[in-house]
């Protein structure tokens, strides 16, 4: 299963879906997050408060989830580029994927693994959702 930043933030910020997402992650055989998604999550968490915010919790979460931080391959970079052209904010498509979303999309597409995410953006693409 691939983690999108939105799912990570929902868990670490104690949002309503966070508990359910934790259950889904704990039952997954394999959990991965794109290196771009990992950085995006750290930036979002740091920007939510002065100082380090919740980003120190990110590494604890990654460890708990047994998530591997996946490097971006050239194939994934090309998939992300196509995803932005088709589903990105500038494309006019209702999914309106951002930069980080495109790398979550690419990792999910490249591996064939479902994506765990919060919101409606990815449900408007051709990806298989984890829930």
Q: Where do the protein language model's features map onto the residues?
A:
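Acidic, PIN/NYN-like endoribonuclease modules and their adjacent C-terminal/linker elements
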Residues: 105-131
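Active-site neighborhoods of divalent-metal-dependent phosphate/nucleic-acid chemistry enzymes
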Residues: 68-114
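Anion (oxyanion) recognition and catalysis
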Residues: 25, 63, 109
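A generic structural signal for short hydrophobic patches within well-formed alpha-helices
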Residues: 8-9, 38, 122-123
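Short, well-structured N-terminal submotif of metal-dependent ribonuclease cores
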Residues: 1-33, 46-60
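Short loop->beta-strand "edge-of-pocket" segments that line small-molecule binding or catalytic clefts
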Residues: 29-32, 65-70
């Amino acid at each position: 299963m691939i983690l999108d930043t939105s799912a990570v933030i929902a868990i670490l910020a104690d949002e309503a879906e966070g508990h359910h997402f934790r259950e889904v992650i704990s039952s997954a055989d394999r959990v991965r997050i794109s290196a771009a998604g990992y950085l995006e999550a750290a930036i979002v968490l740091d920007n939510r408060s002065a100082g380090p915010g919740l980003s120190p919790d990110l590494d604890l979460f990654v460890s708990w989830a047994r998530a591997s931080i996946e490097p971006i391959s050239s194939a994934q970079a090309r998939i992300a580029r196509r995803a932005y052209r088709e589903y990105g904010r500038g494309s006019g498509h209702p999914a309106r994927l951002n930069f980080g979303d495109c790398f979550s999309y690419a990792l999910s597409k490249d591996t064939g693994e479902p994506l765990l995410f919060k919101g409606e953006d990815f449900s408007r693409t051709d990806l298989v959702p984890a829930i």
